[in-house]
From Swiss-Prot:
Key word NAD present: yes
The protein's name in its UniProt record: Glycerol-3-phosphate dehydrogenase [NAD(P)+]
Active-site annotation: 192
InterPro entries in the cross-refs: 6-PGluconate_DH-like_C_sf (IPR008927), 6PGD_dom2 (IPR013328), G3P_DH_NAD-dep (IPR006168), G3P_DH_NAD-dep_C (IPR006109), G3P_DH_NAD-dep_N (IPR011128), NAD(P)-bd_dom_sf (IPR036291)
Gene Ontology CC terms: cytosol
Family in the record: Belongs to the NAD-dependent glycerol-3-phosphate dehydrogenase family.
GO MF, any single term: glycerol-3-phosphate dehydrogenase [NAD(P)+] activity
EC number(s) on file: 1.1.1.94
Pathway entry: Membrane lipid metabolism; glycerophospholipid metabolism
Gene expressing this chain: gpsA
Catalysis performed (reactions): sn-glycerol 3-phosphate + NAD(+) = dihydroxyacetone phosphate + NADH + H(+); sn-glycerol 3-phosphate + NADP(+) = dihydroxyacetone phosphate + NADPH + H(+)
Function recorded in the entry: Catalyzes the reduction of the glycolytic intermediate dihydroxyacetone phosphate (DHAP) to sn-glycerol 3-phosphate (G3P), the key precursor for phospholipid synthesis.
Binding site for NADPH: 11-12, 33, 106, 141, 256, 280, 282
């Protein structure tokens, strides 16, 4: 049995806490809403973020981060990307020694365009870091909460660390593979949110299956192109954290990014969409970060650029589709050299 603190009591943090508790670990979860923590402790449910799911009674919720981190040397962080530095700065006050830092957030830090593992390594002193591990893959919290079969990837620079996290989570309904490509795994999980937003727009516009299939395929090419330029293994993008996560996020009604895009495609403004969602839509911030990265690194990402113009420059979604369809003709295999 391992003592683990889950930092972040949203839908995904709560679902992962459930997996760990099902495996017999000593699980604590922290959130900044005291009434929500009380509900988890007394009613064993998180009605705001994971309604309808009965949580194991062994999960103990805290609204005090200091109390939640007592005698813990494994932490799992699942908070919005924009909150990471602030949360990490608080956490390092209370972590006592070398700790395994797992993160399961899919995004890029706004403003710096850094991967979350980079943010952790910047904010946490070396003597408090045993390993940094990423948990990512095609996994909606709603289905994990129902204990439906789910498969994800544990990635770390040190494979033994990835395997240790694999062992923490593996059970009859939650399968975990390992991968040493922490860069590719993080970027696949973050960048697919951009394509999911665009896929939602195509569905909102009623463009049909042909358009959506093309968008997803060419979107994966963009993800792999930028990922390779940043040091990721191109094979990673054909796996669970690339193609797998892209498929589930572009096709499921559980996907916040798809739902947001669908509303945009039906004519709602970005402000209306974000207000109605009630939860973080990482793809919006990631689109901005990825667009800036692509320009800086001189990587061609036409879908990302078109979505950026829709979200931040007020471009019409139909005009964006037209601009993509009207691009200069190309050979499909022109992208291949970038991926080898």
């Amino acid at each position: 049995m391992t003592k683990i603190t889950v930092v972040g009591a949203g839908s995904w943090g709560t679902a992962l806490a459930m997996v760990l508790a099902d495996n017999g670990h000593d699980v604590r979860i922290w959130g900044n809403r005291s009434e929500l923590m009380d509900e988890i402790n007394t009613k064993h449910e998180n009605s705001r973020y994971l309604p309808g799911i009965t949580l194991p009674s062994t999960i103990v919720a805290y609204s005090s981060l200091e109390e939640a981190l007592v005698d813990v040397n494994v932490v799992l962080i699942v908070v919005p990307t924009k909150a990471y530095r602030e949360v990490l700065q608080d956490m390092k006050k209370y972590v006592a020694g070398p700790t395994t830092w797992i993160h399961a957030s899919k995004g890029i830090e706004p403003g710096t365009s850094k991967r979350i593992s980079e943010v952790i390594e910047e904010e946490i002193p070396e003597d408090l870091i045993k390993d940094v591990v990423v948990l990512s893959g095609p996994s909606h919290a709603e289905e994990v909460g129902l204990r439906q079969a789910t498969t994800v990837t544990s990635a770390a620079k040190r494979m033994e660390a990835a395997e240790e996290v694999q062992d923490l989570f593996m059970n009859s309904y939650f399968r975990v593979y390992t991968n040493p490509d922490i860069v590719g795994v993080e970027l696949g999980g973050a960048l697919k949110n951009i394509i999911a937003l665009a896929a939602g727009i195509t569905d909102g516009l009623g463009l049909g299956d042909n358009a959506k299939a093309a968008l997803m395929t060419r979107g994966l090419t963009e993800i792999a192109r930028l990922g390779r330029k940043m040091g990721g293994n191109p094979l990673t993008f054909a796996g669970l954290t690339g193609m797998g996560d892209l498929i589930v996020t572009c096709t499921s009604v559980h996907s916040r990014n798809w739902r947001a895009g669908n509303m945009l495609g039906k004519g709602h403004s970005l402000e209306e969409v974000l207000e109605s969602m009630g939860m973080v839509v990482e793809g919006v911030r990631t689109t901005k970060a990825a667009h800036e990265l692509a320009e800086k690194m001189e990587v061609e990402m036409p879908i990302t650029a078109a979505l950026y113009d829709v979200l931040f420059n007020g471009n019409n979604v139909k005009d964006a589709v037209g601009s993509l369809m009207g691009r200069v003709r190309k050979h499909e295999v022109e992208a291949i050299p970038d991926l080898l």
